[in-house]
C-alpha cells in the first residue's frame, strides 16, 4: 500500500476546506527548506558547519554556524514565493518584510531556525520550529507589531527534528501529524496520523541544576515528583532531559510526559527562558492538537497577548493531567499568598 506524501496530505487538507492553496504552498516551501537544513546538519564536521559563528543574536546568545546557515536557508526559500508578507526569526533583531521586488502574500512566518543548536557539536538531535499567522488586514508593510498576536491565532505550526531520521511534525489546526523524510525520494511521507499524548504520565523533563533558583510552588511540585511512591503523588517518576526543546517535546508527543522550563531567579529580569513566539506558541499548538496542554504554570500559553517579538515565558507542556497538577501547585501557592 502506498504511503501518503506531505504534498498529497496538504492537497487533501485543501480539498477538505481546512487550508487554502497559498498556505499549502507555504508549508511545502518550509518543508523543502527543512530538507536543506537536514542535509547541512547531517554533514557535520565534513561540511565545516560546526562551531561558533563568532556573532550573537538579539538575546545576546552566541550563534553557531548552523544557526546562521539555517536562518539564511529559511529566509531565501520563503522570500520570493508570493505567500508571505513578512518573516520573523529568533536570530534577527526585527521582523523582515518580503522584499519589494517580490509579491507579498497574506501570511506571517515565525521560526527558530535551529533549536538546540548548542548541542550540534556533540551530535544531539536539533530542529527547526515554525509558526504561521495571518497578516492583519490593511497592513501594507508589516512590522514587528503585525506579529503580536496570541498563539490561538496560529493557523499552522510545526517543527522538523534532525535526528536518526528527519521528521516533520505539523498541525494546521486539525490534529498533529508526523512525516518522515524519505531521503531516496527527497520527500516527506506521513508516518503517524493524529498523534495523541497520553493524559497521564510518570515522566518529566526539566533541568534540575536550576532547582535552587526556582520559586516555591516549583520546589514543592518537583519535590513531590522526586518523592515518588512514598510521597503524596503515590507513584514513581522518571526524569529525562536532552536540553533540546525539539527533542524533548518530540519524545512527549510520541510517548507522553511533561516538559518544564519554569521561571527562575537566576535572571529575574527575564520572564522565562523560552521564547513565546518562536517556541512556546508553536509547540503549544502542536501539543494541544495532540490532546495535551500547554501553560506557563499560571495561564494557558495560547491565550497570552504578546507585547514584544522576543518575549519570553515559562513553559509547562505535555500530558494534560500532569500539566493541570503543576498548575494546581502554582494557583494554590498564589491563593495562599493572598
Curated annotation (Swiss-Prot):
Binds 2 magnesium ions per subunit. The keyword Phosphoprotein does not apply. It is found in: Cytoplasm. One of its GO terms (cellular component) is cytosol. Keywords: Carbohydrate metabolism, Cytoplasm, Hydrolase, Magnesium, Metal-binding. Substrate binds at residues 115-118, 207, 273. Mg(2+) 2 binds at residues 112, 115, 279. Pathway: Carbohydrate biosynthesis; gluconeogenesis. Mg(2+) 1 binds at residues 90, 112, 114. It catalyses: beta-D-fructose 1,6-bisphosphate + H2O = beta-D-fructose 6-phosphate + phosphate. Its cofactor is Mg(2+). Its main location: cytoplasm. GO terms for molecular function: fructose 1,6-bisphosphate 1-phosphatase activity; magnesium ion binding. InterPro entries: FBPase_C_dom, FBPase_class-1, FBPase_N, FBPtase. It holds the Pfam family FBPase. GO terms for biological process: fructose 1,6-bisphosphate metabolic process; fructose 6-phosphate metabolic process; fructose metabolic process; gluconeogenesis; sucrose biosynthetic process. Its EC number is 3.1.3.11. Belongs to the FBPase class 1 family. Homotetramer. This is Fructose-1,6-bisphosphatase class 1. It comes from Stenotrophomonas maltophilia (strain K279a).
Amino acid at each position: 500500500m502506498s504511503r501518503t506524501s506531505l504534498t498529497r496530505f496538504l492537497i487533501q487538507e485543501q480539498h477538505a476546506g481546512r487550508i487554502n492553496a497559498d498556505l499549502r504552498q507555504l508549508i511545502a516551501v518550509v518543508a523543502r527548506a527543512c530538507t536543506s537544513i537536514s542535509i547541512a546538519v547531517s554533514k557535520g564536521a565534513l561540511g565545516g558547519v560546526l562551531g561558533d559563528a563568532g556573532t550573537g543574536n538579539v538575546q545576546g546568545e552566541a550563534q553557531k554556524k548552523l544557526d546562521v546557515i539555517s536562518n539564511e536557508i529559511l529566509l531565501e526559500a520563503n522570500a520570493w514565493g508570493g505567500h508571505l508578507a513578512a518573516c520573523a526569526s529568533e536570530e534577527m533583531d526585527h521582523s523582515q518584510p518580503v522584499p519589494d521586488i517580490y509579491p507579498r502574500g497574506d501570511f506571517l512566518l515565525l521560526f527558530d531556525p535551529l533549536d538546540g543548536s548548542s548541542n550540534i557539536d556533540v551530535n544531539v538531535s536539533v530542529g527547526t520550529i515554525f509558526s504561521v499567522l495571518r497578516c492583519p488586514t490593511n497592513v501594507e508593510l508589516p512590522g514587528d507589531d503585525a506579529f503580536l498576536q496570541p498563539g490561538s491565532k496560529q493557523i499552522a505550526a510545526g517543527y522538523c527534528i534532525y535526528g536518526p531520521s528527519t521528521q516533520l511534525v505539523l498541525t494546521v489546526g486539525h490534529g498533529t501529524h508526523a512525516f518522515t523524510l524519505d531521503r531516496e525520494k527527497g520527500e516527506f511521507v506521513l508516518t503517524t496520523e493524529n498523534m495523541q499524548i497520553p493524559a497521564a504520565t510518570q515522566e518529566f523533563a526539566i533541568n534540575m541544576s536550576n532547582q535552587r533558583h526556582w520559586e516555591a510552588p516549583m520546589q514543592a511540585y518537583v519535590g513531590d515528583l522526586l518523592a515518588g511512591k512514598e510521597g503524596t503523588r503515590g507513584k514513581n517518576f522518571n526524569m529525562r532531559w536532552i536540553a533540546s526543546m525539539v527533542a524533548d517535546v518530540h519524545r512527549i508527543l510520541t510517548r507522553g510526559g511533561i516538559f518544564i522550563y519554569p521561571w527562575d531567579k537566576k535572571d529575574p529580569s527575564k520572564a522565562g527562558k523560552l521564547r513565546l513566539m518562536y517556541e512556546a506558541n508553536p509547540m503549544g499548538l502542536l501539543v494541544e492538537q495532540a490532546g495535551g496542554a500547554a501553560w506557563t504554570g499560571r495561564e494557558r500559553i495560547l491565550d497570552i497577548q504578546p507585547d514584544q517579538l522576543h518575549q519570553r515565558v515559562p513553559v509547562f507542556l505535555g500530558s494534560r493531567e500532569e500539566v493541570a497538577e503543576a498548575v494546581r501547585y502554582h494557583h494554590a501557592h498564589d491563593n495562599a499568598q493572598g
